[in-house]
From Swiss-Prot:
Residues 1-22 form the signal peptide. The lineage of its organism: Eukaryota, Metazoa, Spiralia, Lophotrochozoa, Mollusca. The modification 4-hydroxyproline is found at P52. Keywords: Amidation, Calcium channel impairing toxin, Disulfide bond, Hydroxylation, Ion channel impairing toxin, Knottin, Neurotoxin, Secreted, Signal, Toxin, Voltage-gated calcium channel impairing toxin. Found in injectable (milked) (IV) venom. This is Omega-conotoxin-like CnVIIE. Residues 23-45 form a propeptide. GO terms for cellular component: extracellular region. Expressed by the venom duct. Disulfide bonds join C46-C61, C53-C65, C60-C70. The presence of a 'disulfide through disulfide knot' structurally defines this protein as a knottin. The cysteine framework is VI/VII (C-C-CC-C-C). It comes from the Eukaryota. Belongs to the conotoxin M superfamily. InterPro entries: Conotoxin, Conotoxin_omega-typ_CS.
Length: 71
């Protein structure tokens, strides 16, 4: 019974901490697009600027494929 109460209190405390942290960090992230592009290039295999690309198989790190080349 004591263990159950301790687990319940711990879960409630962790949930409250996450909610407080999420509320405090709202609107503080700057340069969102830059971060998402960086995250995309680090998490997937993509082609650099000037490399051949296909609009069907979206695979450029820069996010744009023009005239068959990443740009």
């Amino acid at each position: 019974m004591k263990l159950t109460c301790v687990v319940i209190v711990a879960v409630l405390l962790l949930t409250a901490c996450q909610l407080i942290t999420a509320d405090d960090s709202r609107g503080t992230q700057k340069h969102r697009a830059l971060r998402s592009d960086t995250k995309l290039s680090m998490s997937t295999r993509c082609k650099g600027t000037g490399k051949p690309c296909s609009r069907i198989a979206y695979n450029c790190c820069t996010g744009s494929c023009r005239s068959g080349k990443c740009g």
